[in-house]
Design a protein with these regions (language model features):
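Sec-dependent signal peptide recognition
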Residues: 2-9
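A short, solvent-exposed, low-complexity linear motif enriched for acidic/polar residues
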Residues: 20-252
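N-terminal signal peptide c-region/cleavage motif recognized by signal peptidases
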Residues: 14-16
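Short glycine/threonine-rich turn/loop motifs
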Residues: 252-363, 423-541, 574-576
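Stable alpha-helical elements in mature extracytoplasmic
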Residues: 58, 96, 286, 303-306, ...
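C-terminal capping alpha-helices of c-type cytochrome domains
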Residues: 375-419, 508, 518-576
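Second-shell loop/turn segments in exported
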Residues: 90-91, 276-279, 296, 366-369, ...
Length: 576
């Protein structure tokens, strides 16, 4: 061999191996068929009919086995899978090219990640609580697998189940053997049969074993889930086909002025990082314009109403009336929601029909029962009074509906609430009373008599630093055919009678309560969840798992929970 060829060979050997990407494509299955959500067609080993409404889980600890039996660890990768949200892909990048004999991953995350501060994660990170909805709030730690749904026993009586697998000891390794040809980018298609989680090596019966688990030590349901998980996964194929991935295009800010001042958004260090709009960065000039427009009666047809008319600042921007009232005294159909911590929401109104704040802000202006004004008329009126303000907030003084929406969005995004007595207590600046502390413990504790846990179970829907999960739920009110909530938007049967979960921050000053303002006091709200829950087909599983009527709280428990709820009032609204 010539010296030149030898040098070339040595050079090639010294170069790093080619890096490839292994894509994972999950297929949610049930009884060897594609999973159909909210479909009571599946059977437990005990013959109980059940439906799945939620299958959400975390994956981590990825590794590939080499031919010699050693493992290539890929520890930085974390993925969130969710059947309802259609989250079913992951990608393992920078994998050395070659052939591997197995893929390993874990359902759940490692102890360090589980104990870490969830507020550290980027707005789009799988472990951001606002993304995955799987962080266990002030208790700490993540839910590794959330499996929820409805079921019926032999007597046909409806019920709900809520299985939450969590805690470090229950992190479960899954090993899928196969021929992983990664000489180039490839895709591993993986089946996850949800039904096998319930009827695998240790089959579960809702009637016999129980309808909920929070994975307390020694819980046999959690142990059964861990035993069943490995058998629920199967490797279908490994191919060189790579799934199409939508590339994120560059987003340019809309109409920024030549000179502007960035706005410093204030929020608690416990809050998740919010997904702020990249095309509408917060600047002081645009926020100021948005606040001016929020209080401008020119947005209404007869000049009598502004946004603030139904959303007064002193009531945490909530409407104190049962139903909102528009121009000429026209009564609306729903109660006006409070307007704070909106930066963490991705859909707006009680039914979620607006996908952004800029769109939401323009709807009441045009609604016949609210401001009842045409946008072209608003543009004309504002063009006579606010062009100078638009010139400061945008790259020209032009007034347009889009710019009105962007300015209102900017202002609304800045309305954060994070300085309550509870927040100060968490910072060590104040101390909760004995009754308030008892209420906090009840709020954050599951009600699971099977395991001796008798909490108020509030945290499932109202957990986390924001005290809401931003989901749509049927919370046990009788279904009104005149207002079916989220169903109006999606037309999905599972959404009949579901409405947006409101934050419980400032709850003491945002009465009346519910989408129709039916309850005027917190006592009435607690009575509803204690004894007044109506069992319907779409009742949320976290309520349907309880006995007929609800939680059946004692008078002392109700008082304690209410005492805690009153600690969630921001100091800006405490003197209302």
């Amino acid at each position: 061999m010539s010296v030149s060829r030898l040098c070339l060979l040595l050079l090639l050997l010294s170069l790093p191996a080619q890096a490839v990407t292994l894509h994972g494509l999950l297929r949610h299955q049930a009884e060897q068929q594609p999973l159909l959500l909210d479909s009571p067609r599946y059977k437990t080993s005990a013959g109980e009919t059940f439906a799945i409404t939620r299958a959400s889980w975390l994956l981590s600890g990825f590794a590939l086995q080499r031919g010699d039996g050693s493992w290539l660890e890929l520890p930085e990768n974390v993925a969130w899978m969710d059947a309802a949200k259609k989250c079913a892909q992951f990608a393992l990048a920078e994998v050395p090219a070659g052939r591997y004999t197995a893929l390993r991953f874990h359902v759940g995350i490692d102890a360090a990640a589980n104990a870490a501060n969830p507020a550290q994660h980027a707005a789009d990170h799988p472990l951001n609580p606002n993304v995955c909805g799987l962080h266990w709030s002030w208790q700490g730690g993540y839910i590794f697998l959330a499996l929820e749904g409805s079921w019926r026993g032999a007597d046909g009586a409806p019920g709900g189940f809520s299985y939450h697998l969590a805690r470090d000891a229950n992190r479960t390794a899954i090993v899928l053997k196969g021929d992983f040809d990664l000489t180039g980018d490839a895709t591993a298609e993986i089946e996850f049969d949800v039904a096998k989680v319930l009827k695998g090596a240790k089959p579960l019966s809702f009637a016999k074993d129980g309808v909920s688990t929070h994975s307390q030590p020694g819980d046999p349901i959690a142990a059964a889930l861990v035993a069943n998980l490995p058998g629920a996964f199967a490797l279908r194929t490994v191919t060189s086909h790579v799934p199409g991935i939508a590339r994120v295009s560059e987003v340019k800010p809309i109409g920024l002025p030549a000179k502007f001042t960035p706005f410093q958004l204030k929020m608690s260090s416990t809050f998740p990082i919010p997904p702020l709009p990249r095309d509408n960065p917060l600047i002081e000039e645009r926020v100021a314009l948005g606040e001016r427009l929020f209080n401008d009666t020119a947005l209404s047809r007869d000049g009598t109403l502004s946004c603030a008319s139904c959303h007064p600042r002193e009531r945490a921007f909530a409407d104190p009336r049962k139903l909102s009232v528009g121009v000429e005294g026209r009564v609306g159909t729903r109660q006006g929601m409070p307007l704070f911590n909106l930066a963490w929401k991705t859909s707006f109104f009680w039914d979620g029909r607006a996908p952004s704040l800029r769109e939401q802000a323009l709807i009441p202006i045009q609604d016949h029962l609210e401001m009842d004004e045409a946008l072209e008329n608003v543009v004309k009126k504002l063009g006579k009074t606010t062009r100078e303000h638009f010139a400061h907030a945008f790259d020209s003084p032009e007034v347009t509906p889009e710019r009105i929406g962007l300015a209102l969005e900017s202002f609304l995004l800045t309305l954060t609430s994070h300085d309550s007595k509870f927040d100060r207590a968490m910072r060590g600046e104040e101390k909760l009373s004995t009754e308030e502390q008892r209420g906090f413990e009840l709020f954050m504790q599951e009600r699971e008599p099977r395991m001796g846990s008798m909490g108020a179970d509030c945290f499932h829907c109202h957990g986390g630093a924001l005290f809401t999960d931003h989901q749509f739920r049927n919370n046990g009110l009788a279904i009104d055919e005149a207002d079916l909530g989220r169903f109006r938007v999606t037309k999905a049967a599972i959404d009949r009678g579901t409405f947006s979960t409101p934050s419980l921050r400032n709850i003491a000053v945002t009465a009346p309560y519910m989408h129709d303002g039916r309850f005027t006091t917190l006592e009435q709200v607690l009575d509803h969840y204690s004894e007044g829950v109506r069992r319907t087909d779409t009742l949320d599983p976290n309520l349907a798992k309880h006995p007929e009527g609800g939680l059946h709280l004692t008078a002392e428990e109700k008082r304690a929970v209410i005492a805690f709820l009153k600690t969630l009032t921001d100091r800006r609204f405490e003197n209302h």
